[in-house]
Design a protein with these regions (language model features):
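Juxta-kinase regulatory segment immediately upstream of eukaryotic protein kinase catalytic domains
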Residues: 1-18
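ATP-binding glycine-rich phosphate-binding loop
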Residues: 13-35
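Active-site acidic catalytic loop and adjacent metal/ATP-binding pocket
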Residues: 28-34, 41-42, 177-222
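ATP-binding pocket architecture of kinase catalytic cores
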Residues: 35-134
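A glycine-centered beta->alpha junction motif in the catalytic cores
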Residues: 47, 95-108, 154, 273-290
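A cross-family kinase active-site recognition segment
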Residues: 109-164, 188
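Active-site activation/catalytic loop segments of kinase-like enzymes and analogous catalytic loops
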Residues: 221-255, 270-288
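ATP/Mg2+ or Mg2+-diphosphate-binding catalytic cores
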Residues: 277-323
Length: 323
């Protein structure tokens, strides 16, 4: 029996057409389900992610923050509570159900200054909900890149060559990031942690923020810097500084507290390294499903390009930061 049939039976839903796979999920699988009771989005959670240590605790914390954002009127697409729970489980498969929102993620060539100002504004609103002046839990990044390089040599020669060429930049980014994290101002607030273009669905000027499982308390300055880059073309290795500054201005105009030391934020912004490691593991078949190798290969290529581009763009980025 398929998971769709099991869900329909458990929640008394009558499915009226074949569920449609939705694009965009790089970690989990998303489907649109038409039923007589309405249209829903289903997020099937990656079993290897769910099995990680602390995963269930992190999901539970994110759900509590999601409720808080709902109460504050932030335009999110919250998961549905069924039987008093948000996360659902049938026969060991974990998932979330959502009301379907008829919107789409913007492509980079569709993003305007107005979109960036709006995203800066809503980010400032999220950060203002519960701000605490304390140090965030800091874990030093200690990825053994030489181990992965040696493993990749036997698995994929093309990726091995790319990784080898980029290794000095990757190791420099890891070391500088670890040093910079110690210099961050002691402040944490609610952060989405992945509010880039793929996780905001637009219908005209109306929008919903999705992918809320990563909600947690983190340094708001880091999230501001990272998202201003993501919304201004960093994903395509083509930053438009007009969009970059529009995002920062939107945040500032909405009362968001602005950073002073942008260079520290630049060095701290090395989360791409963790995404690179995750996808290298997919290519090597470590802690993942057999169907994840191809997406891993593409993501490793893309992420290495991002890391190299970011290193090249340091001076122009810092020149366009506003106080």
């Amino acid at each position: 029996m398929s998971i769709f049939t099991k869900i329909a039976e458990k929640y008394d839903l009558k499915i009226i057409s074949e569920p449609v796979c939705l694009s965009g999920g790089l970690m989990h699988k998303m489907y649109k389900i038409n039923t007589q009771q309405g249209t829903f989005a289903l997020k099937l959670l990656n079993p290897f992610v769910v099995q990680r240590e602390n995963a269930m605790d992190n999901y539970a914390k994110a759900e509590r923050i999601e409720l808080l954002l709902e109460q504050k009127g932030i335009p999110i697409l919250p998961s549905l509570s069924l039987g008093g729970r948000k996360m659902q489980e049938i026969d060991g498969e974990y998932f979330y159900l959502f009301d379907y929102f008829p919107g789409k993620a913007l492509k980079s060539n569709e993003i305007t200054s107005d979109h960036c100002k709006e995203m800066g504004k809503v980010l400032a609103e999220i950060h203002s909900i519960d701000k605490k002046y304390e140090n965030e839990a800091f874990y030093e990044m200690s990825v053994d890149w030489n181990f992965y390089l040696a493993e990749m040599k036997h698995t994929n020669t093309k990726l091995y060559a790319m990784l080898k060429d980029a290794l000095p930049v990757i190791q420099d980014s890891q070391n500088k990031g670890n040093q910079a994290r110690k210099k961050l101002p002691p402040i944490v607030s609610i952060c989405h942690n992945d509010m880039d273009c793929k996780n905001v669905l637009w219908n005209g000027s109306d929008y919903r923020i999705i992918d809320l499982e990563c909600l947690s308390y983190n340094n708001p300055f880091m999230e501001l810097f990272e998202l201003a880059l993501c919304w201004s073309g960093y994903e395509d290795c083509k930053i438009d500084f007009q969009l970059f500054q529009a995002f920062l201005q939107g945040y500032k105009n909405a009362g968001g507290e602005m950073p002073i030391d942008w260079e520290t934020l630049y060095d701290c912004n090395n989360g791409r390294l963790e995404w690179l490691e995750y996808n290298i593991k997919r290519v090597l078949g470590i802690d993942c499903g057999n169907d994840e190798k191809e997406i891993g290969i593409e993501q490793v290529k893309e992420t290495i390009q991002h890391i190299i581009y970011y290193a090249k763009m340091k001076n122009p980025i810092l020149e366009h930061c506003i106080m």
